[in-house]
A protein has these predicted regions:
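Regulatory and interdomain segments flanking nucleotide-handling catalytic cores
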Residues: 1-483
Length: 483
């Protein structure tokens, strides 16, 4: 029997579901940016809305103060954040009635400020064992996810004009666009973020050079084996005070390692470039997960800067606490369906994780894919039907990715046309490939080509896929090299 020493309190878990769907269900770049802002601030908006209704929630969980169920029960707060991480919010309320009241405030705020962000709420009676309470919360959360209805706030009538992507009713026309309530709120959030200096995605994609520079990259990075680490940090403890302190430290450390330091490193790396193309914007960043959108030419710099920062953080950590991650890069034109492009990025990340798991998830991997002519299949099908035996992806970051970059820079000496011819010959067959290698070797003997080198063969195929974006010399590159 569970020890009921929770002073009548309840522990609640809030979980934002279908986050990517909310962000990417539109293909309008400003609305994608606004949707990401709303999701990033949804819990802070909840705390402010609760405060206006007289519900006091202590959300200062990062201050380092020790948490105690007894101290909370005797405090003047109605609720207190235990910790937040990975899109989840753990919070304690003084009673179930307070929890219900908070949920009413939260639900109204979601409807008024975001319109369709979906949050799952679950609660259990607080005991003296945090780990057992958390397990019960996860089970309840899973039950609600599998049985709850996913609904939209407003259905439409036959006479109602609807958004062609979301089928929500159109409520306003602005800038030659028909907007739903959700679209309006996302645009409003975007305008607020733009006021404080956030990068316009229109600028990132190079809209001023439409047709020549409209390639974007969606980069999805996810930490390796983080659920095991969360479990390990509370392995030999069970009380709320001890577990909460451990989880708060872990959450802050993960955010620092996976988000804060890498983002700073990316900004510093891209600041070195003067071509105006190397820009990026965070879409989701929290815990061990981060999604970025950048100009496709910047993607390689973004990823290398990210993992350099992650490695730098690991140097100060013991072996059992070092952090590892995998990244997926999906490159597409700015008019491509972002939801599909994101899924490809996520699947590229997962292909890296499969290789990392074979090494106890203690290796960083990067995979990429160029979505040239629409997205009609998942990543696994594309690899099996179009690239089987041709690609070396995914690449281990420290050695293999460096080798890929070095090979791309070295092979640029033979020219774009020859690299493309080699890749095309691989698809035709071995004899065609060997013929092309010998032809090019006769003109460029110093290129180091060898038709029997299987590793180099796969590198050439991968380089050809992204040569124009990452390795071809631009006027700006030549100018910077001469300075």
């Amino acid at each position: 029997m569970m020890a009921q020493t929770g002073y009548g309190c309840v522990t609640a878990l809030y979980d934002c579901r279908s986050k990517q769907e909310y962000i990417y269900r539109t293909n309008r770049i400003r609305e994608i940016s606004g949707g990401s802002e709303l999701l990033a601030n949804v819990y802070g908006m909840f705390f402010r809305a609760a405060g206006k209704k007289g519900l006091r929630i202590n959300s200062d969980w990062r201050s380092g103060a020790e948490f105690s169920v007894k101290a909370f029960a005797e405090s003047g707060f109605d609720g207190e954040v235990i910790y937040e991480g990975g899109g989840n919010l753990f919070i304690m309320y003084k009673s179930r009635e307070t929890y219900i009241r908070a949920n009413r405030i939260f639900s109204r705020m979601l409807l008024e400020k975001t319109y369709t962000i979906s949050v799952i709420a679950a609660c259990v009676e607080t005991t003296d064992n945090f780990k057992e309470d958390r397990t019960r919360l996860y089970k309840e959360n899973s039950r609600i996810k599998s049985t709850d209805w996913i609904s939209v706030p407003c259905n439409t009538l036959p006479i109602t004009q609807v958004d062609r992507d979301t089928f929500m009713p159109i409520v306003k026309k602005e800038d030659n666009c028909s907007l739903s309530r959700e679209s309006m709120l996302k645009r409003k959030a975007f305008e607020k973020s733009a006021e404080v200096g956030e990068m316009f995605l229109d600028d990132i994609s190079g809209e001023e050079n439409k047709g020549t520079e409209s390639l974007l990259a969606v980069i999805y990075v996810d930490g390796n084996a983080m659920s095991k680490k969360v479990k390990a940090c509370t392995e030999n403890i069970s009380g709320y005070t001890e577990c909460t302190s451990a989880l708060r430290r872990f959450s802050i450390s993960a955010d620092k390692s996976f988000v804060e330091r890498p983002i700073s490193a990316i900004k510093a790396k891209l600041a070195e470039r003067t071509d105006g193309r190397h820009k990026f914007r965070r879409v989701i960043a929290g815990g061990d997960e981060i999604t970025l959108i950048c100009n496709a030419r910047a993607a390689l710099d973004v990823v290398t800067a990210y993992f350099s920062a992650l490695d730098e953080e690991n140097r100060s950590l013991p072996d059992d606490q070092k952090n590892y991650a995998c990244a997926g890069i999906a490159i597409a034109h700015s008019h491509a369906p972002f939801s599909d492009v994101y899924e490809i990025a996520e699947q590229c990340c997962e292909s890296g994780k499969k290789k990392s798991r074979a090494q106890d998830s203690r290796v960083n991997y990067v995979d990429f894919h160029f979505c040239r002519s629409g997205i009609t299949n998942d990543m696994e099908t594309i690899r099996e039907t179009q690239e089987a035996g041709l690609t070396a992806r995914p690449y281990e970051v420290s050695a293999e990715l460096s080798g890929f970059i070095s090979a791309g820079q070295r092979l640029s000496a033979i020219g774009r046309a020859n690299i493309k011819d080699l890749a095309a010959a691989m698809i035709k067959g071995d004899s065609c490939y060997r013929f092309e290698v010998e032809r090019i070797k006769s003109r460029y003997p110093a290129a180091g080509l060898d038709s029997g080198d299987e590793k180099l063969r796969k590198l050439i195929f991968d380089i050809a896929q992204v040569y124009d974006i990452w390795f071809a010399k631009t006027e700006t590159d030549e100018q910077e090299a001469s300075e």
